[in-house]
Amino acid sequence: LLSLQKPKTNFPDEVVFIGYHQITELYFKLALQELMCLGQEKELNKSSFLLRLNRVNRYFEALIRSFSIMVEGMDQKEFLRFRMALLPASGFQSVQYRQIELYSTDLLQLVTLSKRGEFSKTDPAEKLYPYIYWKFGATEQLTGKKTLTLTQFEERYDQELLTLSKHCMTLNLWQLYKKLPAEDQKDIAVIEALKSNDLNVNVYWPLAHYKSAVRYLAKSDQDIAATGGTNWQKYLPPKFQKRIFYPELWSFEEKETWGKGWVEDQIKSILKGF
């Protein structure tokens, strides 16, 4: 891992940026392993389901707690200078994160919000995949065209992710949960573990990134594009994307206000520094 750290500039904080992204991918690898193991269980039960799901939750909680390394741990001026050397690379291109999403929920829940109502859970992956939300997240703000970041990612991983989408239609976390005995599906520990997973992946983790983006990229008069050209103002906030893995576990009000309060509180505190 250390040998792979090859900064493109002489700014010390670029090493912080690279190192933390490596740490993130290591935790993603651990989370993926647990999700894949769950799908391979021949006799899935509540105990094994909770064991592995709680492991996934701990990995994400560790990442969320440690994200201050990114938010507070780099000099803004240095970041704005070395970031240009990283183009078109972006955290957006983490294929492991996309895999975690596919292993977590029905593909319909990952369809971009504006198109989700046009499909159903029974639609094949080939029909749903072209409208997965992140395909609309790395577009040029002025033209709406795909960025080089997105184009390169699609060329390298689209077929692999489509194949995985098909595989996960019956083996994602939600479908595995539905295979548990009815009594176990009502177990508070199981429900709370799923809800924690939903919040960790779809609220707290994206918002940690949003907090960092506001600190480094937001200005009072204009916003700077992210390293991969991601339209981060619309891509990161949960209230815009409404990515909810397990909507059946949440109340109407909870879904309507998904991530809203956290965003408003965090952004107010950060903007005070400008």
Residue ranges with predicted function:
Residues L1-F274:
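Surface-exposed peri-terminal alpha-helical interaction modules
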